[in-house]
Swiss-Prot record:
An example Gene Ontology biological process: ubiquitin-dependent protein catabolic process via the N-end rule pathway
Record gene name: bpt
NCBIfam families: PRK01305.1-1, PRK01305.1-3, PRK01305.2-2, PRK01305.2-3
Name of the molecule in the record: Aspartate/glutamate leucyltransferase
Organism placement in taxonomy: Bacteria, Pseudomonadati, Pseudomonadota, Gammaproteobacteria, Aeromonadales
Protein family membership: Belongs to the R-transferase family. Bpt subfamily.
Organism, scientific name: Aeromonas salmonicida (strain A449)
Length: 238
């Protein structure tokens, strides 16, 4: 039986979509602070919500439904040949978990944004932007460090929830782009979910028509929230 919950939400003004420039975007923003905890947020994830900083939101666009929440079952996931190669390529890295936001994280983030996303909405990077996006007062994120010979070359931020993980953002040293650390970060979070008995890894929103957002469809099988129901997807798009 599905439990119905009445939520108090606000609606942002319309503005240009950052994924599909020809569309107008509006967001539902949670106003009910009773759900600002790990278990409450996990329930909201199943309904298509997402965290950014302290805020929880969900797309509520007037003429578009391109954003689809996507999640991967940690036990059912089957890596592709290329994903297996990426995992093998990065076996020389040390993975370290931390709840402390270390100064070297921002230094790496700043370099990543300047060199990889200088044409995007996150440029120029700033400490205020970094904290406002990743930090959360009611649930500190977990940082998954990727180190080579003790040198930090990548960080994946994720929310560790009772029965799932929710991937937030990954940034890395552009000098190591050939390692495909973004893919490796997702594979590592799936490994962490499986190792700790957590069922799902949430990857946020898939937008098929946006190159920066459609990479998520390569992790199979996965589920997408379509018209209020989670649908299993087990084949690659044509």
């Amino acid at each position: 039986m599905t439990e119905e919950v009445i939520l108090k939400v606000g609606l942002t003004p319309k503005h240009q979509c950052s994924y599909l420039g020809h569309e107008q975007e509006q967001l539902l923003v949670l106003m009910d602070h009773n759900l600002l905890n790990a278990s409450g947020y996990e329930r909201l994830l199943t309904a298509g919500f997402r965290r950014s900083g302290n805020d929880i939101y969900r797309p509520h666009c007037p003429a578009c439904s391109a954003c689809q929440s996507l999640r991967i079952h940690s036990e059912r996931f089957v890596p592709s040949r290329s994903q297996k190669r990426i995992r093998q390529l990065n076996q020389d890295l040390e993975l370290v978990l931390s709840y402390d936001d270390k100064p070297e994280y921002y230094q790496l983030y700043e370099r990543y944004i300047r060199e990889r996303h200088h044409d995007g909405s996150m440029y120029p990077p700033s400490r205020t932007q970094y904290k406002g996006f990743l930090h959360c007062d009611w649930m500190p994120p977990l940082y998954l460090e990727m180190r080579k010979d003790n040198r930090l070359i990548g960080v994946a931020t994720t929310d560790l929830l009772p029965h799932s993980l929710s991937a937030m953002y990954t940034f890395f040293d552009p000098a190591h782009a050939d390692r495909s650390l973004g893919t490796f970060a997702i594979l590592s979070q799936l490994d962490l979910a499986k190792r700790t008995g957590r069922t799902w890894l949430y990857l946020g929103y898939l937008v098929e028509a946006c190159r920066k957002m459609n990479y998520k469809r390569q992790y199979l099988p996965h589920e997408r929230l379509i018209q209020g129901e989670w649908k299993n997807i087990d084949t690659k798009p044509e």
